[in-house]
Amino acid sequence: MEELIHLAYAIDTFYFLICGVLVMWMAAGFSMLEAGLVRSKNTAEILTKNIALFAIACTMYLFLGYYIMYSSPEGGFLPNLGFLIGEENTMDAVLSGGEDAPYYSMRSDYFFQVVFVATAMSIVSGAVAERMKLWAFLAFAVVLTGVIYPVSGYWTWGEGWLDAAGFSDFAGSGIVHMAGASAALAGVLVLGARKGKYGPNGEVHAIPGANMPLATLGTFILWMGWFGFNGGSELKMSDIDSANNVAQVFVNTNAAAAGGVLGALILSKLWFKKADLTMALNGALAGLVAITAEPLEPTGQGAALIGAVGGAIVVASIIFLDKLRLDDPVGAISVHGVVGLWGLLAVPLTNADATFGAQILGAVAIFAWVFIASLVVWLILKAIMGIRVSEEEEYAGVDIAECGLEAYPEFTKGSK
């Protein structure tokens, strides 16, 4: 019997770590997606942001964020602060066999959680692209990953007051994606739109991305990484029930992404009279975000429908935000924020234990906390160091101004 417990512990720990690696691979997906959707003169800077934010997220969560997010007391509003991850699980604790016996390594839990933090910050990167100062962005990343995200994470996954209120978010439609979009929205409001994006009479000028093949590759990488994002949130797979659950989560994750693509393509055809690749890519991501709140309970067909609704929502949301003159170069606020809200509200449709009241409460609480806290931080950064590059630097491209190099030097010389 002891040998079986040892084996189950090893399997669950290894599964957790592999899923964490898949989620880390999503950082490459975000990098490629954003690099493809910005103009060539801004590519090196956005790639720099993505690798730097990942390093900052890993560091801040290691030294501070993890201890805020997983602190006592249960059901509380304000977290306590510890200073050590603590001793690893002992053999006696694992072999005790009780309901509370640990079944995976604490270090694997930390590793899985830290890559989620980086995902939340990656969402901000694309929304403020092409006009934000690099170091202002990185300073904000320190605060979001070290404090803002962990506090709302404590309320939910850390068994705080939202968890006690019955809020349900399996893998993070709200906790990760809507939180990242809320921080992005605050940044966009303080930062303003790119030069030339909107005309004086309400015109919206398209600013195409430089490399759609790269953006498409990034989307497929994210699609792949999402299997770890949702599948790992089952937390184990060493018994029959959990293994079956993981398989269902994988099926539903894939079905929702496919539904999102079709929903976005069909609405784009009806609305614009053409198939829009950018909308299709965002539709895939929207389907993935939508199912993330509850990827286990729906049938595969139900997951496809949830994803299709998300794909349609993202098309309408991107157009609507442009009408409001909220400039989001990659559609991150729509994909992760608006569709993240849809994902939370869809949970009670398939999960009998969830309620619309608790889901709405959780959505409002997460948005209010992250948006207000982020807005304060953005305003402080604006006052202290400025957050926007000069007009000349924006027209020339932030690659040279912020990084001193270009991603495509043969093609961007003198480009405006």
Briefly describe each language-model feature range.
Residues 1-416:
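Hydrophobic alpha-helical transmembrane bundles of multi-pass membrane proteins
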